[in-house]
Amino acid sequence: MDVLAEANGTFALNLLKTLGKDNSKNVFFSPMSMSCALAMVYMGAKGNTAAQMAQILSFNKSGGGGDIHQGFQSLLTEVNKTGTQYLLRMANRLFGEKSCDFLSSFRDSCQKFYQAEMEELDFISAVEKSRKHINTWVAEKTEGKIAELLSPGSVDPLTRLVLVNAVYFRGNWDEQFDKENTEERLFKVSKNEEKPVQMMFKQSTFKKTYIGEIFTQILVLPYVGKELNMIIMLPDETTDLRTVEKELTYEKFVEWTRLDMMDEEEVEVSLPRFKLEESYDMESVLRNLGMTDAFELGKADFSGMSQTDLSLSKVVHKSFVEVNEEGTEAAAATAAIMMMRCARFVPRFCADHPFLFFIQHSKTNGILFCGRFSSP
């Protein structure tokens, strides 16, 4: 699992940097579900297509493929287990053109390792029906939060393989914020721009630390049951968040967020209430990272999946997060942010300027979600 956590964590931070190239934009995605979805495709890839995928997914370090898929099997079992005090639903499915004769061995492996189905649709003669079918499936899996994953025209009669990957998360804070303390404050989007946000406030004991080399505070907000944590990285007001992003590697992330190395102290926390809904067409992102062959007919080698000549037509990722006084819900809408109130000598953690946030699964160290809040 540790090897897999490192591979997934490395991929997560590479994605964060790629998706976050435009500094003014908010970012939110689930690297774990993207890794799962792509690893499933990787299972059917061969030759150079597989080599490129292993490279961007950081599977090279882990020595071979078989243990990767078993690793995902354990990870998904752990993350999707029932009886938790949070709700997390990860839905992966490959939709293939039915004339392509997908190998039963590949379908069986999808089910065994990834709890995922390979479903055959008629893209050639019923493209709109296929699109609606995929959207309905996603909506069901995400409690209706992600309703229109594939927009009209996003699949066509030439579509052969659509990889769909959706996540829904809802969790309450271990210690909730009192709604009466929430008030409108200004969020410093940049040196010369401020926007109003609804700022939540709580004074309590939390784990936190300060990383001197990047002038950044790190705060850990646990969810009920303490199986999941939100980790917030907030640079000092004089430090640009880009500096933090540039320095961030998986090794540093692990070192900086080690709970046993943090102080538990009373702190005044101001955190914006926000909602983010982000949708990414992952093809250009994955191509930029070096995964090119998979998308090109003639170059793509998915002979472990089907004997038909196949390429990946579409990789869509959509995710939602809502952070409020009760906790977090992956849900659709727009965002809001925060500022601080008068302090005694209690340290302040005042997220009234851009910050990074991560939702991590404690037991597996898996980064379930990554985000950047730049602007309400």
Curated annotation (Swiss-Prot):
<comment type="similarity">
    <text>Belongs to the serpin family. Ov-serpin subfamily.</text>
</comment>
<dbReference type="GO" id="GO:0101003">
    <property type="term" value="C:ficolin-1-rich granule membrane"/>
</dbReference>
<dbReference type="GO" id="GO:0005615">
    <property type="term" value="C:extracellular space"/>
</dbReference>
<feature type="modified residue" description="Phosphoserine">
    <location>
        <position position="151"/>
    </location>
</feature>
<dbReference type="GO" id="GO:0062023">
    <property type="term" value="C:collagen-containing extracellular matrix"/>
</dbReference>
<keyword id="KW-0722">Serine protease inhibitor</keyword>
<dbReference type="GO" id="GO:0097180">
    <property type="term" value="C:serine protease inhibitor complex"/>
</dbReference>
<keyword id="KW-0646">Protease inhibitor</keyword>
<dbReference type="GO" id="GO:0005737">
    <property type="term" value="C:cytoplasm"/>
</dbReference>
<dbReference type="GO" id="GO:0070062">
    <property type="term" value="C:extracellular exosome"/>
</dbReference>
<keyword id="KW-0209">Deafness</keyword>
<dbReference type="InterPro" id="IPR042178">
    <property type="entry name" value="Serpin_sf_1"/>
</dbReference>
<dbReference type="Pfam" id="PF00079">
    <property type="entry name" value="Serpin"/>
</dbReference>
<comment type="function">
    <text>May be involved in the regulation of serine proteinases present in the brain or extravasated from the blood. Inhibitor of cathepsin G, kallikrein-8 and thrombin. May play an important role in the inner ear in the protection against leakage of lysosomal content during stress and loss of this protection results in cell death and sensorineural hearing loss.</text>
</comment>
<dbReference type="InterPro" id="IPR036186">
    <property type="entry name" value="Serpin_sf"/>
</dbReference>
<dbReference type="GO" id="GO:0004867">
    <property type="term" value="F:serine-type endopeptidase inhibitor activity"/>
</dbReference>
<comment type="subunit">
    <text>Forms a complex with the monomeric form of beta-tryptase.</text>
</comment>
<dbReference type="GO" id="GO:0071470">
    <property type="term" value="P:cellular response to osmotic stress"/>
</dbReference>
<dbReference type="InterPro" id="IPR000215">
    <property type="entry name" value="Serpin_fam"/>
</dbReference>
<dbReference type="GO" id="GO:0005886">
    <property type="term" value="C:plasma membrane"/>
</dbReference>
<keyword id="KW-0963">Cytoplasm</keyword>
<keyword id="KW-0007">Acetylation</keyword>
<dbReference type="InterPro" id="IPR023795">
    <property type="entry name" value="Serpin_CS"/>
</dbReference>
<dbReference type="GO" id="GO:0030667">
    <property type="term" value="C:secretory granule membrane"/>
</dbReference>
<dbReference type="GO" id="GO:0007605">
    <property type="term" value="P:sensory perception of sound"/>
</dbReference>
<dbReference type="GO" id="GO:0070821">
    <property type="term" value="C:tertiary granule membrane"/>
</dbReference>
<dbReference type="GO" id="GO:0005829">
    <property type="term" value="C:cytosol"/>
</dbReference>
<dbReference type="InterPro" id="IPR023796">
    <property type="entry name" value="Serpin_dom"/>
</dbReference>
<protein>
    <recommendedName>
        <fullName>Serpin B6</fullName>
    </recommendedName>
</protein>
<dbReference type="GO" id="GO:0002020">
    <property type="term" value="F:protease binding"/>
</dbReference>
<keyword id="KW-1010">Non-syndromic deafness</keyword>
<dbReference type="InterPro" id="IPR042185">
    <property type="entry name" value="Serpin_sf_2"/>
</dbReference>
<feature type="modified residue" description="N-acetylmethionine">
    <location>
        <position position="1"/>
    </location>
</feature>
<dbReference type="GO" id="GO:0005576">
    <property type="term" value="C:extracellular region"/>
</dbReference>
<feature type="modified residue" description="N6-acetyllysine">
    <location>
        <position position="195"/>
    </location>
</feature>
<feature type="site" description="Reactive bond">
    <location>
        <begin position="341"/>
        <end position="342"/>
    </location>
</feature>
<keyword id="KW-0597">Phosphoprotein</keyword>
